Amino acid sequence: MVRLGLAVILAAVGTVLVVGGLMNVAGPAPSDGPGASAPGSDVAAASPGSGVAAASPAATRGVEPATARAPTPSPSGDPVLLGAGDIARCDGTDDEATAALLEGLPGIVFTLGDNAYEDGSTAELRDCYGPSWGRFLDRTRFVVTGNHDLHTDDGAPEAAYFGDAAVRDGVTWFSEDVGAWHVIVLDGNCGLLGGRCGADSPQVRWLRDDLAASTARCTLAMWHQPRFSSGQHGNDRAVAPFWDALYAVGADLVLNGHDHDYERFAPQDPDGNADGARGITEMVVGTGGIGLEDFETSAANSIVRSSLAHGVIELTLQPSGWGFRFVSTDGSFSDQGHGTCH
């Protein structure tokens, strides 16, 4: 398949087509500082020289070339999360490039699964993940279990390597508060090791109880397989019970990997309908180092997509919202903006 080297972003001013080069599209005027947006929305803010476009939820298939700018620490001292999924293999170097980004950026590190290819073995964690992202184990607090991570002894090497960043109380789903946010790690390997994702499964029962007990205004959940995706794996209906539980309590943000690309969706309900009032924003960040893959389709409500750049997502967890910025390793692509919690 030929990889597309163009950008198509439907912005507030109309459809913009860019073939190569940089693009700047003036979006709606921010209402509350750079990158601010209306409550519940999630719109990338354009700024002079940034190459970052403001896009509407109706954006069509495309890639947005841009000039990445390294994020700066939050001046307010709000917690920062940094991460991606689909990270390390010994015959590649792109994971070392994304690790170099982590080295220059302060914050808590998370992974979105498929951390050490091909099989999550002890040797692969030591020899492939270790020299790159493994240098930041002391900063790594949230580790998602991907399907490749279960290939060896049902994930035992990963549990031993990451400890309670990956497994707590004997399971691969857990939560904790970070600043004003409730952060949840889930296991989306629904068909492996028995049913894990059904509405009456122990994991989803735990999730509903955990959400009911939380007093945080803002909620973020992360797991490996995306419910919605334009990528090679497409939509995963098996994780729909996660979305049902999260949407019912007004959760705000979901992070996934699995597809080897970057994609951001407008807020949606569990059925994939646009919902600017109560919808959840999903980001797929499978750009940690494994070879990138072309998109298979144009999923509804997908507003930014790139399969051309490895990188990490930086999230600034503010008391009533979040700032986000995708930082690529080669400076070829960036996506940034702000969302407001429900």
Where do the model's predicted regions map?
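Extended active-site neighborhood of metal-dependent phosphoesterases/phosphodiesterases
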Residues: E103, Y117-C218, H233-G234, A238-A248, ...
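N-terminal active-site segment of His-dependent metallophosphoesterases
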Residues: A68-C128, P202, D209, S229-S230
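Residue-level marker for buried hydrophobic side chains located in beta-strands
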Residues: L81-G83, V109-T111, V143-V144, A221, ...
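C-terminal region of N-terminal signal peptides and the immediate post-cleavage residues
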Residues: T15-S47, A53, E64, R89
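Short, solvent-exposed aromatic-acidic interface loops
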Residues: R325-S334
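N-terminal export and membrane-targeting signals
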Residues: M1-L10
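N-terminal low-complexity, Pro/Thr/Ser-rich intrinsically disordered segments
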Residues: S47-V80
